[in-house]
Amino acid sequence: FADGKGSTYAYGYTKKQARKTEWEWLLDRIFEKGKALDALDQCIEQEKKEIGKPRFKHKVVLGIAIPLSKQKDWGSIDGTPLDFNRQADQVKAAQWYIDQLMSRFKKAKYKNLELSGFYWVDEDIATCKDLPKYVSQYIHAKKKEFVWIPYWKAKGYDQWKELGFDIAYQQPNHFFTKDIPDSRLDEACELALRHGMAMEFECDSKALYDCEDSSYDRMLAYIKAFEDHNVFETSAIAYYTGSKGLLDLYHSSSPEDKKIMDRLARHIVARRSIKALTK
């Protein structure tokens, strides 16, 4: 989560901490015409001509840039310089960013998108500690949801409710490391159920059947585990697909890629159909 010029918006990416200037650049990128949210809105508008108008707006969850502890050069709000050694200043910066996201989203007047909540991009609380709890209070006051996706057994994963999150998705962290056995997926599904968590489905373009060092079988293992544990029927699911994993699978001419895409698509369509019937 960085700007491509060396500045980071979360822990663990680069050493240079993003300042208010970089936060504003990120906001401009999120709401840039023809990109990101605007492109998504246009895409849905185009598809409506083919499949008809849905009975709902697509819900959007936007990530929050993290106020990085010990940062002193972030900038000012209302003329007051902020020091992220102080948690109160971290909360103030997060509130400012949330306000910016909400204001710009409203101003954009998207036809097909609804801002439903915010996502905490840190995948553990080793450094941010209990900061999410105080940010959550502001988010809930705005009547929005607070979402988290901790990595496998990350610090604080089993405290997600106490930290103020409305939903947390368990990352199996299986797809990308080939020496992790498929049993990790069973364990992740069971762990998520035990702690009241949802699940994340992970893949990228390495899932292509004919690509070098293919991870096709690992994506297949996710689908099988989710079927075996009734995740598709009973759980919320977040999908991490790299930059264009599903797009590459869609464009592939391989029969095996079509087979796995169809298998996943059937579950997604069934989930949407069930949801529509219950409304």
Give, region by region, the residue ranges found by the protein language model.
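Alpha-helical scaffolding within the catalytic cores
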Residues: I98-K106, K133, Y151-Q159, S183-A188
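Aromatic- and acid-rich polysaccharide-binding/catalytic face
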Residues: Y110-D124, Y157, K161-D179
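Short helix-terminating capping/connector loops at secondary-structure junctions
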Residues: I51-K57, Y110-L115, V231-T234
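N-terminal catalytic cores of secreted or lumenal carbohydrate-active enzymes
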Residues: F1-K92
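Aromatic-lined carbohydrate-recognition surfaces of secreted/lumenal glycan-active proteins
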Residues: R55-D73, I77-I98, E114-I125, S136-Y157, ...
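Surface-exposed amphipathic alpha-helices with a cationic face
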Residues: K48-G52, M102, L131-E145, C189-L193
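Substrate-binding cleft of secreted/luminal carbohydrate-active enzymes
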Residues: K153, G164-K279
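Alpha-helix N-cap and loop-to-helix initiation/capping positions
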Residues: K35, L82-W96, T127-D130, I180, ...
